[in-house]
Amino acid sequence: LTGQNIPVTVHMRQEGGDVLGALEEMLTVARVLRIPVHISHLKAMGRDNWGTKIPQALSMLEQARQEGLDVGCDVYPYTAGSTQLIHILPPDFLTGGMEAVVPRLRDKDARRELAERIRRGDGFDDIAKLAGWDGIRLTSLHCPEDHPYQGKSIAEIAALWGQNPLDCCCDLLVREHCEITMVDFMATEEDIVTILQSP
């Protein structure tokens, strides 16, 4: 690809706390390979990043353009995303597929480790931390006894069950064999407008 005018369009590896580090990696790719780079769905996920990371990211892109690089971005135009609930788990927790994940979710020691990793943050886009348990709403549940919880947040369900949100989430994942979808609210309208208004 070096020196060819073939654009590389990417979803960055991190869109939360290290979104600027991930952007710098892609700008380095543009510099080293001398190719156009387009960032797809630029966003800064998580309340801690709202209003601060996007202006910095846009400034980095503008500076790169002033250096002569052909770089740009588009915007994810929604404040929420939709995916499977298992994506609150670190990628390595999913090793072995659902046949391994479900027993792991039952294990109290594994849950304690999971809680610590979510609290600490360890490099993955941690949806539980970025959206908050109140920002994760369940959109499909298969077991009839869970149907009343459709549309409710993990925080709401945990309060109804008298549990902490992580245990509630793990219990639901076990019962539903990890086949739960969610809407996660982790972006802000202000950042979307800022990106849309940038040159």
Please place each PLM-identified region on the residue numbering.
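Hydrophobic, small-residue-rich alpha-helical packing segments that form membrane-like cores
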Residues: 1-33
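Active-site neighborhoods of metal-dependent hydrolases
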Residues: 36, 41-199
